[in-house]
Each structure stands twice: as structure tokens, then as C-alpha cells.
């Protein structure tokens, strides 16, 4: 089912790029952006994890730097029958984490500096088990591709809107009116892209990752306590992250910001904690 959603997501986001091309350059623009979208589909499938790592400014971490982190991940992956993912540190004081990659054999888990400082052993195990559950359930590819495409669409929209702004002095015969209309069309692209992301990444996958992760860790209380801590910290400690990648994290890193609601795919923390506590593992 997730493989079908990946292809549907690629097709939908490619269609958005074609619409952008058509708004900019008519049929030739639409054709150009169609070819670009084909290239992006191939790139995002094989390299979207690297895009996600780059968007969050995460860096590789060695076992010498974080032996405790490696120990927990190695123990959990062995228990779950998963290969060892690449591990990264995200330079942010906000405690958070995410997983990325196209399949279990090509996966990565990133944790923030703040997460390693805040959580105790049981809570850290719960968070890492949740991220490994996303890998085990093969949720990470669709989330990572969505982040890569949404980031690209946002960048293209910004470039074209700046071009339209600086071309406002032209008259309609010189194309100024067309550029302005294109910029108005592009202003509608971000909500559409966000809606597609919300449809593609079901909140039920977060609930399933919570449940799978709790069983993997053998303790539902650790993840429940961690979610409460992370949610509280996310409201107090800002995180500089591209909104297009916010859905990758275990809790919304943009809590309290209006744009966070636009891109939010996170179910309420209170409901997630309630379900975990009901498991009583």
C-alpha cells in the first residue's frame, strides 16, 4: 500500500510542477517542468534521504562520539530484525528526532543535541524505537520524498515570485501582467502541496509507529513520557527547520507557528500518550 502511495505522491507533485511551468511559460514551460519532474522523481527516490539530512543540517555521528546512542540503536535493531541505520546529530537545542531513507537497508536516524541532553535511558529507547518502527513499517520513503518535493516547490515558487516582483514595472505587452498572474497562481501552490502531504502521510502511521515502537522497546511508558517532554520543549525552544520537513519529526518542531498547522501531520500528543498508556507494557 505504501508503494502505491509513493507513486501517487510522485504523480501529484509532478503535476504541480507542470502547472508551475505552464503558468510561467505556457506549453513549452509545462513540457520543461515535466522533464524536470521526471528527473526529480528519480533523484528523490534515490537521494531524498540526503536532501532531508541537508534540510535539517544534520551531521554524521561516530560511535566514539555517541557510544550510548549506538548501543541503544544496535540493541533495538537486533530485536526488530533490522539492519543498522546511519546515525546523525541535528544541531538544535530542541529535543526531537526523525528517520529517513528509501528502505531498511538504506535508512538513517537523526536525533537533536537537545534530545540527547533531555531524555533518560527509557525515554531515549522509546523515541529511537518509534523511529525504527517507521523504518520497519516502510513509512520513511513517502515522508522523505514529500519533504524533498515540497522543498523544491517552495524554492521554485519563491524564485518565480521574486522574478514577478522585479518585473512589475513592465507593461502587459512586455509580459509583466503574465508574470504577476503567475505569481498569484504560485501563491496557491504551497497550500495545495501541503494538503497533498497531509493526505499522503496519514496520522494513523504515527499511531502505528508509537505502538510498534513501544512493543519493540518493551515499554510503552518510556515513549509516553518522552512525547510529553518533547512536546513541552517544542513549544518553548524554537527550531530552525524548513517547514516542508517538519512532518518527518516525532513531534512537530514548529509548534505554535501558523505555518506549522499548514504542514502538520502530527496527531495530538495527548491522544498518542493516552493510547500508549492504555497498552500498559
Swiss-Prot record:
Q: Which cysteines are joined by disulfide bonds?
A: none
- Gene3D superfamilies from the UniProt entry: Metalloproteases ('zincins'), catalytic domain
Catalytic residues of the enzyme: 131
**What transmembrane ranges does the database entry give?**
6-26, 28-48, 140-160, 181-201
What subcellular locations does the record give? Cell membrane
Q: What class of enzyme is it?
A: hydrolase
E.C. no:
3.4.24.-
**Quick one: a GO cellular component term?**
plasma membrane
Query: How is the cofactor bound, in the record's words?
Result: Binds 1 zinc ion per subunit.
Alphabetical keyword list: Cell membrane, Hydrolase, Membrane, Metal-binding, Metalloprotease, Protease, Transmembrane, Transmembrane helix, Zinc
Q: Set out the biological process GO terms recorded for this chain's protein.
A: proteolysis
Membrane association type: Multi-pass membrane protein
Which cofactors must be present for this protein to function?
Zn(2+)
Enumerate the Pfam families for this protein. Answer: Peptidase_M48
Query: Which residues does Zn(2+) bind?
Result: 130, 134, 206
Gene Ontology MF terms: metalloendopeptidase activity; zinc ion binding
Where, if anywhere, are coiled coils annotated? Answer: none
In terms of PANTHER family, this protein maps to: PROTEASE HTPX
Report the family membership: Belongs to the peptidase M48B family.
What name appears for this protein in its UniProt entry? Protease HtpX homolog
Source taxonomy? Bacteria, Bacillati, Bacillota, Clostridia, Eubacteriales
Amino acid at each position: 500500500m505504501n508503494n502505491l502511495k509513493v507513486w501517487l505522491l510522485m504523480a501529484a507533485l509532478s503535476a504541480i510542477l507542470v502547472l508551475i511551468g505552464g503558468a510561467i511559460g505556457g506549453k513549452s514551460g509545462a513540457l520543461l517542468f515535466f522533464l524536470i519532474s521526471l528527473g526529480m522523481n528519480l533523484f528523490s527516490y534515490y537521494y531524498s534521504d540526503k536532501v532531508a539530512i541537508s534540510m535539517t543540517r544534520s551531521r554524521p555521528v561516530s560511535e566514539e562520539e555517541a557510544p550510548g546512542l549506538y548501543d541503544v540503536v544496535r540493541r533495538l535493531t537486533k530485536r526488530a530484525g533490522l539492519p543498522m541505520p546511519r546515525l546523525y546529530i541535528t544541531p538544535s537545542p530542541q529535543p526531537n528526532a526523525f528517520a529517513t531513507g528509501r528502505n531498511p537497508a538504506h535508512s538513517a536516524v537523526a536525533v537533536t543535541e537537545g534530545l540527547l541532553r533531555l531524555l533518560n535511558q527509557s525515554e531515549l529507547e522509546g523515541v529511537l524505537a518509534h523511529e525504527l518502527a517507521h523504518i520497519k513499517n516502510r513509512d520513511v520513503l513517502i515522508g522523505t520524498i514529500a519533504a524533498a518535493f515540497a522543498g523544491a516547490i517552495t524554492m521554485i515558487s519563491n524564485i518565480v515570485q521574486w522574478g514577478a516582483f522585479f518585473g512589475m514595472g513592465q507593461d502587459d505587452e512586455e509580459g509583466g501582467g503574465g508574470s504577476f498572474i503567475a505569481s498569484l497562481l504560485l501563491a496557491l501552490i504551497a497550500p495545495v502541496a501541503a494538503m497533498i502531504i497531509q493526505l499522503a502521510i496519514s496520522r494513523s502511521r504515527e499511531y502505528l509507529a508509537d505502538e510498534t515502537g513501544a512493543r519493540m522497546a518493551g515499554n510503552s511508558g518510556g515513549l509516553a513520557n518522552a512525547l510529553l517532554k518533547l512536546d513541552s520543549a517544542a513549544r518553548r525552544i524554537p527550531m530552525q527547520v524548513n517547514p516542508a520537513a517538519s512532518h518527518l519529526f516525532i513531534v512537530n518542531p514548529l509548534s505554535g507557528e501558523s505555518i506549522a498547522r499548514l504542514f502538520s501531520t502530527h496527531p495530538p500528543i495527548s491522544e498518542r500518550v493516552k493510547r500508549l498508556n492504555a497498552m500498559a507494557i
